[in-house]
Amino acid sequence: MEVFQAFLSGIPLLQIVGDVDHFTAPALEEAAREALALDRGCLLFDLSAVPYLDSAGAGVFLTLDSQMAPGFWVGAIGANANLLRIFEIVGLGSRPSFRIFARTEDACAVLSDTDS
């Protein structure tokens, strides 16, 4: 797995490439904590190049979601059907602090609305 940091409308965007599993989840969690330290109100993940996510990977998202300050949120962009199913199973899909976007443009639209 590789993690690349970019910004989308001033919000940290972690682009993940590869499987997120027991071996790679700690690196993802570290990158996410560094991005959260920027204190921008939310954190986005581009998951379009993530074919597989196991329970350790889901745990990273659960931990982040549970630690978000009120009004802050985590966004997942481009997750495949398997990842979306995992997010539903672990309960992330129904949490207001965890948002799922099909495309980057959808996340941009929400960020634009937030800025207004």
Model-derived features with residue positions:
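STAS-typified acidic loop motif
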Residues: 1-30, 49
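Non-catalytic signal-transmission and effector/linker regions of two-component phosphorelay proteins
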Residues: 1-5, 106, 112-116
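Residues that form or immediately flank small-molecule/cofactor binding pockets and catalytic motifs
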Residues: 8, 81, 105
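Generic detector of low-complexity/intrinsically disordered segments
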Residues: 15-16, 46, 94, 113
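Amphipathic alpha-helical interaction surfaces in cytosolic regulatory modules
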Residues: 22-97
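Short acidic-hydrophobic, aromatic-tinged amphipathic segments that line or gate anion-handling sites
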Residues: 97-107
